[in-house]
Structure formats: structure tokens, C-alpha cells
Design a protein with these regions (language model features):
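Conserved phosphate/metal-binding and DNA-contacting active-site motifs used
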Residues: 1-167
Length: 167
């Protein structure tokens, strides 16, 4: 996938919650996005010592052997909505996905696979409310990261606060 890091919102870039990742085969299953530290070695979503700045992650990614950069949600004000498999082979978008994107009204990008979307908002992830049908939500306390592409979808370039959409 072509690099679009310049489209990533500045607000997200300001947090030193970045790592790099690469696709690795795990025993015959579909390849998994394995996190790596920008300092070398494995990246851990629960260990800030393995994270770095946006610029460090981009430099590490460009140095080779990595497929992309990722943002860790731990200890941040952001919530990520991950909608998988909602784009059909003709480019059509599932109605539920289109509704979620519209309701969120925040920065949205194509996922690494090109078959789904990531939406990033400011807000708080409700307790126990992480998976809903075809989408999942991650935030502080979820020990997860997003592979960030910068391949923006739509015209919204900023991350907005939208607790109503998160709830």
C-alpha cells in the first residue's frame, strides 16, 4: 500500500505512542500485524518504553523490513473504531459501515488491508462495550494498537470529540 503519512492528523502525531509493524505468518493462518519497537526488538502495547514519536516510527518504517506504523491507544484520549471487511470487491461499502462513518464525523482512513476502515475520535471507551456486529472499538485500557495508513477516506481531516457516537 502506498504511504500517506502526511494525511495523519497532527493531533495524533503529537503523542509518543508510535511503533512499527510487519506482517508475519503465524502457523498457516492469515498474516498477523506484529508490533515492533522503534528502538529495536518487539513492541508492546503495555510498555511505553517500546514506543516512540511519530517521526521516529516513520524513519524506522522507511529503514526497511517493516510494513507500516501503528498508534497505541493506551493512556491517550483517543478511541478507534475498526470496521473490517466492509468494502466489497467492486468498492461498494456496506450500509452499516457508511452509517458509522457518517455518525462518527471524525478522521477516517482505509485500513491496511484496503477492505475496511479505521475511525479515530476523542472520547472514552465505555466499559465492556468493545465489539458490535462488524466493528470493534479500542481505547485507553484496551491494550491495542491500530496500523495507521494515512490513506484518508472522505473529507474530514481532523479528529473530533464525539462521545455520543462512541456510546
Amino acid at each position: 500500500m502506498q504511504e500517506h503519512f502526511q494525511n495523519i492528523p497532527e493531533e495524533l502525531k503529537q503523542y509518543p505512542h508510535w511503533l512499527v509493524w510487519k506482517l508475519e505468518d503465524k502457523g498457516g493462518k492469515k498474516p498477523t500485524k506484529i508490533p515492533y519497537s522503534i528502538h529495536g526488538g518487539m513492541g508492546k502495547v503495555n510498555d511505553p518504553a517500546t514506543w516512540g514519536t511519530f517521526d521516529e516510527a516513520v524513519a524506522r518504517c522507511r529503514s526497511g523490513n517493516y510494513n507500516g506504523i501503528g498508534f497505541v491507544f493506551t493512556n491517550s484520549p483517543f478511541v478507534g473504531i475498526d470496521i473490517d471487511g466492509c468494502i466489497d470487491p467492486t468498492g461498494g461499502i456496506a450500509a452499516e459501515a457508511a452509517d458509522i462513518i457518517e455518525q462518527a464525523g471524525s478522521y477516517t482512513e482505509l485500513s491496511q488491508s484496503g477492505k475496511g476502515f479505521h475511525i479515530i475520535l476523542r472520547g472514552t471507551l465505555p466499559e465492556g462495550k468493545r465489539r458490535h456486529g462488524s466493528f470493534e472499538m479500542y481505547g485507553d485500557g484496551s491494550a491495542r494498537y491500530f496500523a495507521i495508513t494515512g490513506n484518508r477516506w472522505g473529507t474530514q481531516t481532523e479528529i473530533i470529540e464525539n462521545q455520543t457516537a462512541i456510546d
